[in-house]
């Protein structure tokens, strides 16, 4: 490397560039007070305190000489205090130095900048990597400190200096999180002057930049230090205020500079001490974030974030963003006005589109806010955003409800009050959010200005700060030691907690304990304001202190826990946000912005708190724990964890004894905080996040060293996940506290909870957490919550080391006792709250495949308490009245994600029975189960507002509304083979005969007047020999032909039915009527897991779902619609039901939807076998597998599933299962589960997109409305928009008039067969009239083109399910488009025959036959096999073929017929079709025939409950060609003249009439007559 590096050259340039900032000061006294050494410990190892004094003095003398040489006489003394790299005695040329304390020894002469750097490089050229930030601090340092303090105080008294130098010597700098890892730690740890990033990191080495000036004794140091901090907005504080390059002021930092130049790291020595890789990575990181002012600092080996933290927005960006937000607000306002006008003027057809516009505009507005991550961690922003989501969800739901209503004008949702309320709510919420966002942007602009280090832009701000602070130089009282706080500092310092003046007694206590004081959470502003040196760092190898920093730590986290009274800002949420108030008032903090943002740790992801050692990404909340205060790198934590977590409790006691005074100040701060208004946003009690962080630090201090690692692991998000719980509880003895702290670190609760945990019993902690959670649940103003917090925290401050023994015993007891012993009685809150506590078992993590040790139970409880409160406060509270069995871990994971979806999904999860398995697995370990857990309900299927009912009533609502349900659970039978007698389906009313679909349709319409009279879509069951004709007698056969048949195999008693058939819907559409007559769907996985157990619960008989096998005698009298079903139900309770087996099967069923890997539930083909990879599986397993397949080779499975699932499950069931799976995984934090949620949603969109008109029911559409509403409320606007677009399409299709065929046109006698060519008509037509052209007048090519266009139009309308279902049961009404297409085929064939037979002249007939042959040739070239075969069937029909034709015509027709020769299974046609490229219109008749053969020849099940997917695979392959051809369109243009000539082919004769004409032309047995 060159001798003169960048740092050296820039240092030289700086001397001249910034000379105008230098000013001459008085000479130092003979023995200046020592300053922290810039590179290493204040004292060289082995050097006495006196030596150090001499060294410093000599250094100043030497530096004066150097500056004289460099800047001549103009600024002889302006640089004097800068260089601490050359400390040596007046009497010696060299300093005592070692590897950990490097004093550059140079000759006393020739102290030029060149010689200084040269000797420094030469001396350390061969040195190994040195620990810049973790030297081996001598143990005698305490003695040195005391001596130093004595000397300092002597000088203080002489010079009237209020600031002692004790911390200046013993405490290092705390840098702001400017550049990743640019600052070494403090002097006691890193030699005092660590250089922060050149952009805008701020070190508080010996003095903080812009502090109140130090005493006159140290004017050189203070003034030049201020000078350094001023120009670049950053202070590189050396031992004597030394700047970057040994006595030369730092170069003006440029934007994006790496922070090496002009700083300690700019030296060769420092560069060698850092790895090249880290250097490179850091530079790349800074290049990516050009204005990376407050990024997180890194330990060299700590995992770096994948993306650099965002730079604060420039003024132009802020202005542009503000204007953009205002534009969006105007757009939203205009859209809402239009929305209101549309409703007032009853133009409801445009309402869905208007809702879409509003949704898109709000999504666009939110994307602007997200650009600056304004709500990343802000509780206020989160709350405002949730309000917008909730209001928007209501508006979208209003639009969709109006769409679904039969008479839109009479929809109840359109009442003026409701519309006004919905619109006003949304408008207010949007304005509130935008106002907050604009305020945050302005604060960020101020923040960027104050902290900006680019160029000299920060000089003015720093100078202003300096000027404001230097107003009261002597305000502090001499002799107060570490804790002295100047008036200016207390007035200008921004902390999370209000500044509290210390009493003399407190000062004495703190001074006595300042040997290892709590490290303050130094935000950048607090460092600017700090008039006293920060506390010194702890010494290594002490029982109460962790080991020193690792060598690679380049920036010391400033988000460390500290006491407020020390003058150290413990702010975490506000430290990085520029306060809008004047500096003198900034410590009060804008109460409506920062202080109440419990998790608003960093407005722009570049907050000081990102420096927490455990913070693994800029997106995490600040966790100001003691380990970050002690600057542990993650590597050191991991290495020392094994030793530290086994340390004895006496160490904890000693630490408690030393730090109890800190708790006094904390409690005082908390008491003061009670006056602070708070915000409860999104269910989070919002208090300044810094308070939680500080409290966390106290708890960490109390819990000892071993906690550092576990605490680090437990904060992936605001609430820890089960996985993180496991990590933390297994790592240390104090895991309960660490997990607890971390789980609540998002809010003020963390302070009280963690403190009480540190010095109190776990049961006390539980009560506190419950109390806090309870108070938060019942108040929206968090001030009372804060009061609770204060109470609990203040009760702990009186504990001393004697309480530590109690804590030890309780902790040890806690790790050995069962959770049941620890669980205190919960306050009688809502059922929802109680239901949560039931799952506070060690095994609760099973649902997430995680294991939680019993030692973490208390912390687990705490998180659940808080989560319970979160759920209570959730904006979707009205969706959430069904308590569910989700574990706290899931809820915690949900907390860091979207709020609403987990509510409905969780309820769905519970309702679906998935958690019942979990319940019963751990039932023996928990308190008695709540009855509500047995009602497995899907919250997102709710139609009625949950909030209008009491919990007891509402918990059964969805099942109670299923009274008239005819069948229960399509999957219960699909898990394992079992007899029908043991199936819960036996409790259902009897099914109808398999084939009588029209009658079933009629009865289903009668079943409930609230149901839409739409065509049912369920495939018919296959014939069953033992099933009685009326469906109410006989046992079903053990063979299950279809799933639908299985569902219909319910047994009823002979005397149960007042009518032969119960009013049921089609199979698998499990409809039930509640007492008010409303009908809802209850599907597949809703069977209660413990329904057998519930059957004995007489107290819950009210509103009991019919799926529960219980006699309904005690129930209220059912409505007329449900009475027949109830009568059936009373007598169908089975005799031999194994309850455990049933519950186990239901659990197994549900868990398939909740498992990521379901391969074990599938039957895969063997290597030697042919066919699909998946031969069969349970229904849920097939659904999950269809959502998971990603490979191209496996994609066919997904396509086959989507194509054929209607043959074994209802579309509404599939949608319900997919929404359940999505919402289950949506709340999980694991990547694979998030991926599963995305895959599930993709499949859901595919399924909805493929819904046909016959699939659509009001229940299915209502389900989609509810799910879209939940997506909007959870903030998934893009997904909601995607799904809603499909929904609008389907509603339009649903409302279209349904045409089932051309029966009227065919005179009621037309029939469509499998071949599609049979037909008869009673309409005799006449030849075209008037000006109509004749067939011969038109060109054959044009006729063929128009025929093809007509065919293609009908062909593209055919839905694939129609073809499958028609082949299965030949139900024409289920396949309207297929019906239309085949009838078009028939009419064309009859029209061609009629055209020929109506001609009396044989030559004319021959001309027409030749014309049709030409048309057929063109059709063949166009790949229109449908019209081709229609005309061929006409020419080859009996009435025409029997006539005499020329030999050429006969042979040509015969050759055409070879194409559809049936002798070899239509081999010729199949081969021709295989060689055909789209566009093509195939002959549908052959497809229907093939599908019929596959259906008849293959079973639906491989075994009971296991779907035979090979059969569906064959069906899919048959239909695949048809799907392929539907994608392409013909390029022809419509010719209306020819279309009118066709006249829809209505002009045809009937079969009988054509025979009569044919026989007239050629009588039987005679030659044809030419008439």
From Swiss-Prot:
- Give GO terms for biological process: muscle attachment; positive regulation of smoothened signaling pathway; Ras protein signal transduction; sarcomere organization; somatic muscle development
Sequence ranges assigned to domain N-terminal Ras-GEF in this UniProt record: 1170-1292
| Modified-residue entries (Phosphothreonine), positions | 524
- Leader sequence range is none
Record's compositionally biased regions (Pro residues): 532-550
Q: Where is this region: Disordered?
A: 28-85, 202-271, 287-316, 513-580, 614-646, 695-719, 728-747, 776-868, 879-898, 1013-1038
Cite the record's Polar residues compositional bias ranges. Answer: 74-83, 287-297, 620-631, 708-718, 851-866
Pfam families, alphabetized? RasGEF, RasGEF_N
Which of the residues bear the PTM Phosphoserine?
A: 496, 523, 526, 615
**Cellular component annotations (GO), alphabetically ordered:** plasma membrane
Domain of life per record: Eukaryota
Q: In which tissues is it expressed?
A: Ubiquitous.
> A Gene Ontology molecular-function term?
SH3 domain binding
| Classification via CDD domains | RasGEF, REM
Q: What region holds the Ras-GEF domain? A: 1339-1564
- Which stretches are tagged as biased composition: Gly residues? 230-248
Motif (SH3-binding) on chain? 546-556, 820-831, 924-935, 986-997
Q: Which UniProt keywords apply?
A: Developmental protein, Guanine-nucleotide releasing factor, Phosphoprotein, SH3-binding
Q: Where is the composition biased (Basic residues)?
A: 55-73, 298-309
Which PANTHER family does its entry note? GUANINE NUCLEOTIDE EXCHANGE FACTOR, RAP GUANINE NUCLEOTIDE EXCHANGE FACTOR 1
Q: What does this protein do?
A: Guanine nucleotide-releasing protein that binds to SH3 domain of Crk. Transduces signals from Crk to activate RAS. Also involved in MAPK activation.
Q: What is this protein called?
A: Guanine nucleotide-releasing factor 2
Native organism is: Drosophila melanogaster
Query: Which lineage do the record's taxonomy fields give for this organism?
Result: Eukaryota, Metazoa, Ecdysozoa, Arthropoda, Hexapoda
Whichever gene encodes this chain, its name is: C3G
């Amino acid at each position: 490397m060159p001798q003169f590096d960048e740092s050296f050259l820039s240092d030289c340039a700086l001397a001249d560039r910034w000379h105008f900032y230098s000013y001459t000061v008085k000479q130092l006294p003979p023995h200046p007070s020592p300053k922290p050494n810039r590179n290493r410990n204040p004292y060289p190892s082995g050097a006495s305190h006196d030596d150090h004094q001499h060294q410093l003095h000599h250094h100043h003398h030497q530096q004066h000489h150097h500056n004289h040489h460099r800047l001549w006489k103009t600024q002889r003394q302006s640089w004097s205090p800068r260089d601490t790299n050359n400390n040596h005695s007046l009497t010696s040329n060299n300093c005592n130095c070692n590897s950990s304390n490097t004093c550059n020894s140079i000759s006393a002469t020739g102290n030029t900048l060149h010689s200084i750097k040269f000797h420094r490089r030469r001396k350390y050229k061969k040195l190994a990597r040195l620990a810049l930030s973790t030297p081996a601090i001598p143990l005698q340092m305490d003695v040195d400190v005391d001596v130093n303090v004595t000397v300092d105080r002597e000088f203080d008294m002489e010079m009237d200096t209020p600031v002692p130098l004790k911390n200046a010597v013993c405490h290092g700098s705390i840098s702001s999180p400017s550049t990743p890892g640019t600052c070494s730690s403090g002097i006691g740890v890193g030699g005092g002057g660590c250089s922060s990033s050149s952009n805008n990191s701020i070190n508080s080495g010996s003095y903080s930049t812009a502090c109140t000036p130090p005493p006159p004794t140290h004017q050189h140091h203070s003034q030049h230090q201020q000078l350094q901090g001023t120009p670049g907005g950053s202070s590189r504080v050396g031992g004597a205020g030394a700047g970057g390059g040994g006595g030369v002021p730092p170069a003006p930092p440029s934007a994006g500079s790496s922070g090496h130049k002009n700083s300690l790291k700019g030296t060769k020595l420092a560069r060698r001490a850092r790895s090249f890789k880290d250097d490179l990575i850091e530079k790349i990181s800074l290049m990516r974030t050009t204005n990376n002012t407050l990024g997180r600092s890194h330990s060299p080996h700590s995992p770096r974030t994948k993306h650099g933290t965002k730079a604060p927005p420039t003024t132009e960006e802020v202005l542009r963003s503000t204007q953009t937000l205002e534009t969006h607000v105007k757009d939203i306002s205009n859209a809402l006005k239009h929305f209101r006008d549309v409703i007032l003027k009853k133009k409801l057809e445009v309402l869905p589109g208007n809702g879409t516009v509003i949704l898109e505009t709000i999504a666009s507005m939110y994307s602007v806010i997200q650009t600056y991550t304004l709500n990343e961690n802000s509780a206020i922003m989160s709350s405002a955003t949730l309000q917008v989501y909730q209001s928007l969800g209501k508006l979208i739901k209003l639009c969709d409800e109006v769409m679904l209503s039969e008479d839109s004008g009479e929809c109840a949702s359109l009442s003026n009050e409701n519309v006004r309320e919905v619109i006003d709510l949304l408008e207010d919420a949007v304005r509130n959010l935008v106002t907050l966002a604009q305020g945050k942007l302005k604060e960020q602009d101020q923040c960027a200005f104050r902290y900006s280090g680019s160029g000299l832009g920060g000089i003015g701000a720093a100078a202003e700060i300096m000027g404001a602070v230097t107003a009261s130089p002597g305000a502090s009282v001499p002799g107060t030691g570490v804790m002295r706080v100047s008036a200016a500092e207390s007035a200008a310092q921004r902390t999370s907690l209000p500044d509290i003046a210390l009493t003399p007694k407190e000062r004495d206590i703190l001074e006595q304990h300042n040997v290892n004081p709590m490290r303050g959470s130094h935000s950048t502003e607090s460092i600017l304001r700090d008039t006293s040196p920060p506390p010194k760092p702890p010494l290594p190898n002490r029982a109460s202190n962790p080991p020193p920093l690792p060598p690679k730590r380049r920036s010391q986290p400033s988000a460390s826990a500290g006491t407020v009274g020390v003058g150290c800002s413990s702010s975490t949420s506000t430290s990085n946000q520029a306060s809008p108030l004047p500096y003198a008032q900034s410590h009060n903090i804008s109460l409506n912005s920062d202080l109440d943002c419990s998790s608003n740790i960093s407005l722009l992801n570049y907050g000081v708190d990102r420096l927490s050692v455990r913070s693994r990404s800029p997106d995490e909340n600040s966790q100001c724990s003691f380990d970050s205060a002690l600057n542990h790198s993650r590597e050191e934590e991991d290495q020392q964890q094994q030793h530290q977590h086994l340390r004895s409790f006496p160490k904890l006691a000693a630490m408690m004894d030393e730090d109890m005074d800190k708790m006094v100040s904390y409690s005082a701060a908390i008491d003061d905080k009670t006056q602070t208004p708070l915000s409860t946003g999104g269910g989070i009690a919002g208090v300044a996040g810094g308070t939680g962080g500080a409290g966390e630090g106290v708890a960490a201090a109390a819990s000892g060293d071993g906690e550092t690692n576990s605490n680090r692991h437990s904060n992936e998000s605001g609430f820890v996940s089960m996985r993180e719980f496991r990590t933390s509880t297994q790592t240390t003895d104090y895991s309960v506290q660490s997990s607890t702290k971390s789980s609540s670190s998002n809010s003020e609760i963390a302070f009280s909870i963690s403190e009480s945990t540190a010095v109190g019993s776990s049961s006390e902690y539980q009560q506190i957490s419950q109390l806090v959670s309870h108070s938060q649940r019942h108040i929206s103003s968090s001030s009372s919550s804060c009061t609770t917090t204060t109470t609990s925290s203040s009760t702990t401050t009186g504990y001393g080391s004697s309480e530590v023994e109690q804590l030890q015993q309780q902790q040890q007891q806690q790790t050995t006792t069962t959770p049941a012993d620890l669980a205190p009685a919960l306050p009688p809150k809502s059922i929802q709250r109680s239901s949560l506590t039931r799952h506070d078992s060690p095994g609760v993590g099973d649902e997430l495949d995680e294991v939680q040790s019993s030692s973490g139970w208390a912390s687990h409880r705490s998180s659940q308490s808080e989560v319970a409160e979160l759920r209570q406060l959730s904006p979707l509270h009205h969706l959430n009245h069904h308590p569910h069995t989700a574990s706290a871990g899931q809820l915690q994971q949900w907390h860091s994600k979207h709020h609403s979806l987990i509510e409905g999904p969780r309820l769905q999860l519970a309702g679906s029975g998935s958690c019942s398995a979990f319940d019963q697995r751990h039932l023996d370990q928990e308190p008695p189960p709540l009855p509500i857990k047995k009602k497995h309900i899907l919250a997102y299927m709710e139609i009625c507002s949950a909030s209008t009912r009491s919990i007891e009533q509402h918990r059964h609502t969805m099942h109670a509304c299923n009274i008239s349900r005819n069948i229960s659970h399509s999957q219960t039978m699909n898990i394992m083979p079992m007899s029908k007698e043991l199936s819960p389906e036996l409790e259902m009313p009897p099914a109808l005969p398999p084939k009588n679909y029209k009658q079933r349709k009629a009865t289903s319409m009668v079943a409930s007047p609230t149901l839409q009279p739409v065509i049912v879509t369920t495939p018919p069951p296959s014939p069953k020999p033992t099933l009685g004709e009326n469906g109410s007698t006989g046992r079903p056969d053990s063979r299950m032909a279809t799933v639908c048949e299985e569902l219909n195999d319910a047994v009823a008693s002979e005397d149960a039915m007042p009518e032969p058939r119960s009013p049921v819907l089609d199979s698998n559409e499990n409809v039930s009527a509640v007492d008010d007559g409303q009908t809802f769907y209850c599907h597949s996985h809703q069977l209660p897991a413990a329904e057998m157990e519930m059957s004995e619960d007489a107290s819950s008989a009210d509103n009991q779902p019919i799926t529960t096998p219980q006699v309904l005698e005690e129930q209220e009298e059912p409505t007329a619609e449900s009475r027949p079903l109830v009568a059936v139900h009373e007598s169908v309770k089975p005799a031999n039901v194994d309850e455990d087996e049933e519950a186990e099967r239901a659990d197994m069923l549900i868990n398939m939807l909740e498992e990521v890997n379901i391969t074990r539930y599938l039957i895969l083909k063997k290597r030697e076998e042919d066919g699909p990879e998946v031969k069969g599986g349970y229904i849920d397993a097939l659904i999950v597998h269809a959502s998971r397949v990603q490979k191209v080779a496996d994609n066919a499975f997904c396509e086959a599933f989507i194509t054929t699932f209607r043959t074994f499950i209802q579309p509404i069931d599939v949608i319900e299962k997919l929404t359940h799976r999505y919402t289950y995984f949506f709340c999980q934090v694991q990547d694979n589960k998030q991926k599963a949620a995305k895959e599930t949603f993709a499949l859901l969109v595919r399924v909805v997109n493929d819904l046909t008109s016959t699939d659509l029911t009001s229940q299915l559409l209502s389900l989609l409305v509810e799910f879209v509403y939940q997506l909007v409320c959870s903030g998934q606007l893009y997904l909601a928009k995607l799904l809603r677009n499909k929904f609008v399409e389907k509603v339009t299709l649903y409302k279209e008039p349904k045409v089932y065929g051309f029966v009227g046109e065919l005179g009621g006698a037309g029939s469509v067969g499998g071949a599609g060519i049979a037909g008869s008509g009673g309409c005799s037509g006449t030849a075209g009239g008037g000006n109509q052209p004749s067939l011969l007048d038109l060109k054959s090519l044009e006729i063929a083109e128009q025929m093809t266009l007509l065919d293609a139009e009908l062909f593209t309308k055919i839905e694939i399910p129609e073809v499958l279902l028609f082949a299965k049961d030949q139900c024409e009404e289920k396949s309207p488009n297929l019906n239309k297409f085949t009838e078009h085929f028939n009419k064309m064939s009859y029209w061609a025959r009629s055209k020929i037979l109506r001609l009396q002249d044989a030559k004319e007939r021959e001309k027409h036959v030749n014309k049709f042959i030409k048309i057929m040739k063109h059709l063949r070239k166009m790949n229109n096999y449908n019209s081709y075969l229609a005309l061929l069937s006409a020419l080859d029909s009996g009435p025409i073929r029997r006539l005499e034709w020329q030999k050429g015509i006969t042979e040509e027709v015969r050759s055409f017929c070879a194409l559809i020769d049936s002798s070899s299974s239509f081999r010729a046609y199949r081969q021709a079709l295989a060689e055909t490229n789209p566009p093509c219109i195939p002959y549908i008749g052959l497809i229907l025939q093939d599908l019929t053969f596959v259906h008849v020849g293959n079973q639906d099940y491989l075994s009971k409950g296991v779907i035979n997917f090979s059969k569906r695979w064959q069906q899919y392959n048959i239909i695949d060609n048809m799907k392929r051809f539907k994608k392409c369109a013909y390029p022809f243009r419509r010719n209306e003249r020819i279309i009118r000539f066709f006249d829809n082919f209505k002009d045809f004769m009937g079969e009988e009439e054509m025979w009569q004409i044919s026989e007239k032309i050629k009588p039987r047995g005679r030659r044809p007559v030419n008439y």
